[in-house]
Amino acid sequence: KLFSQKVRFKADDGDQFPEWEEKKLGEVFEFYNGKAHENVISENGKYVVVNSKFISTDGTVRKYTNEMIFPLIKKDIVMVMSDVPNGKAISKCFLINENNKYTLNQRICCLRTKENAVFYINQISRNKYFLKFDDGVKQTNLRKNDILQCPLLCPCLAEQQKIADCLSSLDEVIKKQKATLAAWEELKKGLLQQMFV
């Protein structure tokens, strides 16, 4: 409902924000291709290599390197550009959360904007526009020009911030609930072990 504009925020003074504009992704973001890291992978490296496995697992599966070949900065959106037919990783995105920690691998792109990346990541990740490139038969490879043509709905910066703040708050609640659930599952596991010893 948010991106269909059925739910809208108001300005602090109670006024309506202006209508959203439709723009191409290339009008809002700078695009960068990643670089090959296969020859510099190091088990004890100090930088995280952002590859498709990293993004598709929300950052839990990691490879490391000691060479910062393509440095990423906080608020960069990284997106998977290649996947198997009917794969679940194509156009999946990850928001970079700190500087000097991540380096961008090939077949992953970096989308950088001066606008609110937290707002846009929810609109870009697994966008239907990108999913239509998957024909279910051969590997899907998104090209730079195709990515830059993706249509985006763009509210004014003040409304972007309100939306991003709301979504970030919800993400925080979800994170805390997952931690609570994990604690309950551990408690249950411990009780079951004690019951059947």
What would you call each of these model-derived segments?
Residues 3, 19-22, 43-46:
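A short, polar/charged loop/turn motif at coil->beta-strand junctions and beta-hairpin connectors
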Residues 6, 10-35, 149:
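Non-catalytic DNA-recognition/assembly elements of restriction-modification systems
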Residues 7-9, 163-174, 193-196:
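Hydrophobic structural patches
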